[in-house]
Structures are given as structure tokens and as C-alpha cells.
């Protein structure tokens, strides 16, 4: 296990409790949250610890033992009460005014060595006023899945929350969508913010312009401080959020990730991927792939994600328009498509081995690649892995030497091969030398596909064997052939 377990660690002078917690969100006042306590749990077994996050927070992992984690993030001793954040949201296009932190809370906020303020948020820590009849708990499998998602995405270069700890809590839970009874856990994750689009939507629902402006001032001061007292800071904030969200959508699409539940309450005001439920990485390239069994109409399908992000940003205009002129909001949203296209094209070209190829050649190659993948019903990651494994510089002078990375769709393959050859032919000798390196640097050899997750869970569920879980995490942290 990462960092090892020190069962003799003293709970005195707990480094996790001695962090310099800042009352940033708490200082806004109780119009934005409810004070809650953590649930008591019968058992505490540390199953995962995020030593990389500890280092970001300025802690030496060797000084933080198992009992420190259990005391701080299992028993929740030494701090409290905690903040259950209030928000609403559009869920599958329908407005839901009955949301809020239903099984978690804001534990605290700590500034990292990078100068950014990080929220510690919990999942499975007990009931709150927003539990809506639920038990406030997290299944152990759900916790395992979230740890794996955040580790995978972080090391693929996607802006994401990080898992700080996963503690099994010894309760039997009943769920309608998985075999029950099932085991329980509590997760602590770090995120740059847990303020959601839905946080603003709730305030608009109650017609509280004053609270929207107060929250805007907080968000800009804490997360967009470069705008300072700029008279146009509100409009500039929204424009930057649009650009960041477009980039996040491009990151998801390039790595083949389907979030599955892109409701506005799952959209972060810092454009960070978080709250991992029925997510999946695509295997076969299929824009219509849906990861959630309850997404009957494919609203949050893999291919719809950029559009949904744009729709959610447009929905955010309604509450923000109480403070920001609608013309400024519309101008901000107008950059989404070009920002998304630029970031997505750049990432896909890198996966194909190229840097910038120009405004025509680059997009044409990406389009030909996607057409080929879809026509061949090819494995998305396997295609790029095969391309990386077979690449040869001689292809630049011999189009016929370029082999098919996947089987099927011969007509689409010929169109792709012609486009790939034109791209290679445009390169200088020095640029050609970098193609193979880029192919290996940008195409992971380890991808978090569903069979890998299920194999890890089967070992835990049937034999309480955690080694496959830790082994998979190790591979996810080094996903590329070239670091």
C-alpha cells in the first residue's frame, strides 16, 4: 500500500489536524451551507491513502500514519462542525430544487504548495438535511471506483479532484443497483472547489441577487484572483470559466472518458472533473456510448459531452445574469466552440504523433481518424497503441508502407492513410524524429476499462484481496511507455 501502514502511529500531534485550515467558504455565512456532524462508524480500515496529495499539501508521507488518517478522516475527531453545502441543479435537463450535500460535507480548506486553495470534501460521511431519505453512506465499491477514476485521470493529464483517503467503515448497505448487502466506506477527496453551477442556481431560485454577488466575489477572490478589482471582473470570470470548461471537455474526449452524470450540480466553478459515479472509459470508439444504465436517451453519452458542457454553461447564465449583463455572458459563451476545437485538435494530434499541423491539415487528419475509428468499430485505445508500436519514419516517403492499425473499413482506412501520409510529408526531418516519441508519450498502455475495475472489485469482494487494487493504481500512475 502506498506509503505503507504504521499501526503504531500516535494520534497525538496529528499532521492532518495541524494543517493550516482556512475558513474561506465558512466565512460566507450560513446562507450557503448547513452545519452537520459526521456519522459514527463501527470500524475503520484504511484502504487507500493519497501520498501524492500529502506532498502537495506540504506533508511528508512518512510522518503521517494509518491512525492519523483514521482519526482525522474516519472518526472525524478534532474538527467540526462541518459544512453541508447547499445547491440545486438541472438533472437530465429537469430542474431539481431538492439537492445539496446529501452524504458528504466540506471538511476544510487548505492551501497547497502551489498556492491554490484545496477543499477537503467527504463522501459517505453520514446524513445531512439533504439526504432525502438516503442513509448518507458510500458503498466500498463506489469508493474504490472513485479512487481509480481520480488516479487514472490525474496521471492522464486531466484536471480532476484527487482522492486523499478511503476508509472502510464496517457497515452493511443495501442498494438497488448492486448486489446487497454490500460493504461501506468513507472517502475524502481534494478539489480546487466544491462550488458548483448549481450553487448559483439555488440562489437564483430564491431570487437572492445579493447572495449571488457575494458568492461571485468569493469565487473571483479565491479562484480567479488575477482579476482583482477589475471593473469587468464578473464577465472576465465567466469567459475564463467557459474556456476552462471547454478545455476540460476536450481532455475527457481525447482520453476516451465518459463522466456519465453531467448535471449542473456536478459541474465545478473551477472547471474540474469530480464526483465519479457510473463513469467509464470507452473501449470501442462509439460517440453514442452511455456509461449510466439510467441514461435512457443518451443525454450524457460520450459524444454529447462537449455539447452538454456548453448547455450547462448557458444555464449558468440565468443566475449570473442577475449581476452580469447578458450581452457579456453571451460574448463569453461564444468562445466555447473555438476553444474546445483548438484543445481537442491539439490533444488528438499529439496522440497521432504530431504538434501543430496548420489550420487545415490538422483538423482534416483528426476528422479522418475519427471517421476511420467509427467505421471500423475499432478499439479506441488499441488503435493508438498499434500506431505507436508500428510507426516507422519510412512512412514519410511511402504511403503504401503505412499499415492498418485496426481491422475493417478499408475505404475509411485508405482515406485515413492518405491524410496521415500528407501530415508526415509536411514535417521537417527534425519534426519527423519526434513523431515516435509523441506517440508513446501521449497514448497510454494502461487504460481503466470496466473489466479491470470489475476484476479488482471481485478480488476485494470475494477474498478481501487488495493487492490487485494497489497493483492497478501503480500502473495507472505510469500509464505511458515514456514518462
Swiss-Prot record:
It catalyses: L-seryl-[protein] + ATP = 3-O-(5'-adenylyl)-L-seryl-[protein] + diphosphate; L-threonyl-[protein] + ATP = 3-O-(5'-adenylyl)-L-threonyl-[protein] + diphosphate; L-tyrosyl-[protein] + ATP = O-(5'-adenylyl)-L-tyrosyl-[protein] + diphosphate; L-histidyl-[protein] + UTP = N(tele)-(5'-uridylyl)-L-histidyl-[protein] + diphosphate. The keyword Transmembrane does not apply. Mg(2+) binds at residues 266, 275. Pfam families: SelO (PF02696). It is an enzyme of class 2 (transferase). The keyword Methyltransferase does not apply. This is Protein nucleotidyltransferase YdiU. The gene is ydiU.
Amino acid at each position: 500500500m502506498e506509503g505503507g501502514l504504521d499501526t503504531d502511529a500516535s494520534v497525538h500531534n496529528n499532521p492532518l489536524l495541524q494543517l493550516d485550515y482556512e475558513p474561506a467558504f465558512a466565512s460566507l455565512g450560513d446562507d450557503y451551507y448547513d452545519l452537520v456532524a459526521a456519522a459514527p462508524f463501527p470500524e475503520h480500515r484504511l484502504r487507500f491513502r493519497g501520498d501524492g496529495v500529502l506532498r502537495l499539501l506540504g506533508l511528508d508521507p512518512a510522518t503521517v500514519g494509518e491512525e492519523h488518517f483514521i482519526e482525522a478522516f474516519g472518526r472525524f475527531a478534532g474538527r467540526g462542525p462541518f459544512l453541508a453545502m447547499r445547491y440545486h441543479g438541472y438533472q437530465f435537463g429537469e430542474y431539481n430544487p431538492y439537492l445539496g450535500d446529501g452524504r458528504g460535507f466540506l471538511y476544510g480548506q487548505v492551501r497547497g504548495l502551489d498556492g491554490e486553495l484545496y477543499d477537503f470534501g467527504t463522501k459517505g460521511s453520514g446524513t445531512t438535511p439533504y439526504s432525502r431519505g438516503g442513509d448518507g453512506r458510500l458503498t466500498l465499491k463506489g469508493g474504490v471506483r472513485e479512487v481509480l477514476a481520480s488516479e487514472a485521470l490525474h496521471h492522464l493529464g486531466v484536471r480532476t479532484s484527487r482522492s486523499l483517503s478511503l476508509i472502510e467503515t464496517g457497515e452493511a448497505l443495501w442498494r438497488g443497483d448492486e448486489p446487497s448487502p454490500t460493504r461501506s466506506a468513507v472517502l475524502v477527496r481534494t478539489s480546487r472547489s466544491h462550488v458548483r453551477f448549481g450553487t448559483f442556481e439555488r440562489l437564483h431560485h430564491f431570487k437572492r441577487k445579493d447572495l449571488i454577488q457575494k458568492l461571485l466575489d468569493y469565487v473571483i477572490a479565491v479562484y480567479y484572483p488575477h482579476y482583482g478589482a477589475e471593473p469587468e471582473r464578473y464577465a472576465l470570470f465567466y469567459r475564463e470559466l467557459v474556456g476552462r470548461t471547454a478545455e476540460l471537455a476536450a481532455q475527457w474526449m481525447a482520453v476516451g472518458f465518459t463522466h456519465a452524470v453531467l448535471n449542473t450540480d456536478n459541474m465545478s466553478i473551477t472547471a474540474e472533473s469530480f464526483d465519479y459515479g457510473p463513469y467509464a472509459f470507452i473501449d470501442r470508439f462509439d460517440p453514442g456510448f452511455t456509461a449510466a444504465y439510467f441514461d435512457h436517451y443518451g443525454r450524457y453519452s460520450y459524444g454529447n459531452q462537449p455539447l452538454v458542457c456548453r448547455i450547462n454553461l448557458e444555464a449558468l447564465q440565468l443566475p449570473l445574469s442577475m449581476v452580469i449583463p447578458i450581452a457579456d455572458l453571451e460574448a463569453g459563451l461564444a468562445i466555447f466552440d473555438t476553444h474546445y476545437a483548438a484543445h481537442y485538435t491539439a490533444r488528438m494530434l499529439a496522440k497521432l504523433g504530431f504538434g501543430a499541423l496548420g489550420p487545415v491539415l490538422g483538423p482534416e487528419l483528426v476528422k479522418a481518424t475519427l471517421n476511420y475509428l467509427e467505421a471500423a468499430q475499432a478499439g479506441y485505445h488499441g488503435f493508438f497503441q498499434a500506431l505507436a508500436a508500428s510507426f516507422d519514419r519510412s512512412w514519410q516517403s511511402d504511403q503504401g508502407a503505412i499499415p492498418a492499425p485496426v481491422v475493417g473499413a478499408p475505404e475509411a482506412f485508405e482515406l485515413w492513410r492518405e491524410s496521415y501520409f500528407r501530415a508526415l510529408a509536411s514535417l521537417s526531418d527534425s519534426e519527423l524524429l519526434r513523431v515516435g516519441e509523441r506517440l508513446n508519450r501521449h497514448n497510454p498502455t494502461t487504460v481503466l476499462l470496466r473489466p479491470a475495475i470489475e476484476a479488482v472489485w471481485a478480488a476485494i469482494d470475494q477474498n478481501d484481496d487488495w493487492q490487485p487494487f494497489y497493483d492497478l493504481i501503480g500502473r495507472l500512475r505510469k500509464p505511458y511507455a515514456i514518462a
